[in-house]
Amino acid sequence: MGVIEFLLALAQDMILAAIPAVGFAMVFNVPVRALRWCALLGSIGHGSRMILMTSGLNIEWSTFMASMLVGTIGIQWSRWYLAHPKVFTVAAVIPMFPGISAYTAMISAVKISQLGYSEPLMITLLTNFLTASSIVGALSIGLSIPGLWLYRKRPRV
């Protein structure tokens, strides 16, 4: 993949990630003045995850790093715009949730209950379930670590 193709794919990924970020921000009753920032933060998070995955990191670690970036930027923006960090960050990480792997794991579980046990279905179920669980864990831990670091009152040493 050339540089131009990568930049076009990155721009497409970031634009498409902004749409669900704004949608979920509207569901969570985020103030109208903060919707554009939720879209931008969702784009930054999903774009940084794509850059990290393209550079060779797996999806779990890329998601962890991207959610830490989203958490850090959200804390800074919350100081600038006098809002809670969750106003910006929660809707911004929703586009990174593992919908496909969770759906595939659920379909495999339904097939196992209908057709009975088979090793390929069980492997598919476990692989996708563990991937989805790891991504959700990376999102939640990565989003909470910047708050633990930046709001710490005691010295680190």
From Swiss-Prot:
Organism: Escherichia coli (strain K12)
Family under the similarity heading: Belongs to the ThrE exporter (TC 2.A.79) family.
Localisation: Cell inner membrane
Function: Involved in succinate export with YjjP. Both proteins are required for export. Contributes to succinate production under both aerobic and anaerobic conditions.
InterPro entries in the cross-refs: ThrE_2, ThrE_Dicarb/AminoAcid_Exp, YjjB
Remarks, miscellaneous: YjjPB constitutes a split-type ThrE family transporter.
Protein keywords: Cell inner membrane, Cell membrane, Membrane, Transmembrane, Transmembrane helix, Transport
Any Pfam family the entry gives: ThrE_2
GO BP field: response to osmotic stress; response to peptide; succinate transport
Principal subcellular localisation of the protein: membrane
A single GO cellular-component term on record: plasma membrane
Positions of transmembrane segments: 8-28, 50-70, 87-107, 129-149
Membrane-topology descriptor: Multi-pass membrane protein
Binding partners and assembly: The transporter is composed of YjjB and YjjP.
Effect of gene knockout: Deletion of yjjPB decreases succinate production in E.coli by 70% under anaerobic conditions.
Gene that specifies this protein: yjjB
The keyword Transmembrane helix belongs to this UniProt entry's keyword annotation: yes
Name of the protein this chain belongs to: Probable succinate transporter subunit YjjB
